[in-house]
Amino acid sequence: MADNEILQMHDLKPAPGAKKDRTRVGRGEGSKGKTSGRGAKGQTKRNHVRPGFEGGQLPLYMRLPKLRGFKNPFKVEFQVINIARLVELFPEGGEVAVADLIAKGAVRDNAPVKVLGDGETTVAFTLKGVKASASAKSKIEAAGGSVSED
């Protein structure tokens, strides 16, 4: 095509090397004939082996023990927060609800909250809407606070 001619649709063609024919195997000795790239004799020449087959050796999935039991789909996973963390977040004490803990970024709103007894407190907390361990409850009540689960 000369430089001064206008390029037209019928003049377009793929770039050199852009289109490559796929290799047709088993069509003569000149190009991937006979064994067609599968190597010499044997199991993989004739057919394929299924996933997990180890050549007759006892396979891994049969060597390992069966898993026992089941996963309870209704198990309630609590988000835990310790008394020491409560004292950090609310040094003045007072009434603390789950919404306050979410606002401070201590817990998320996708699971219930449980307070554990790690740490000491001298300020009185009034916890609402949370569960508490026995040790946490006794420490909070000793400091003059209270815990309600509703």
From Swiss-Prot:
Record bears the keyword Ribonucleoprotein: yes
Keywords per UniProt: Ribonucleoprotein, Ribosomal protein, RNA-binding, rRNA-binding
Pfam families: Ribosomal_L27A
Recorded GO CC terms: cytosolic large ribosomal subunit
Ranges for region Disordered: 1-55
An individual GO BP term: translation
Sequence ranges of Basic and acidic residues compositional bias: 8-32
InterPro entries xrefs: Ribosomal_uL15, Ribosomal_uL15/eL18, Ribosomal_uL15/eL18_sf, Ribosomal_uL15_bac-type
Gene Ontology terms for molecular function: rRNA binding; structural constituent of ribosome
UniProt superkingdom: Bacteria
Alphabetized NCBIfam families for the sequence: rplO_bact
Quaternary state and interactors: Part of the 50S ribosomal subunit.
Family: Belongs to the universal ribosomal protein uL15 family.
Role: Binds to the 23S rRNA.
Name of the protein: Large ribosomal subunit protein uL15
Natural source organism: Bifidobacterium longum (strain NCC 2705)
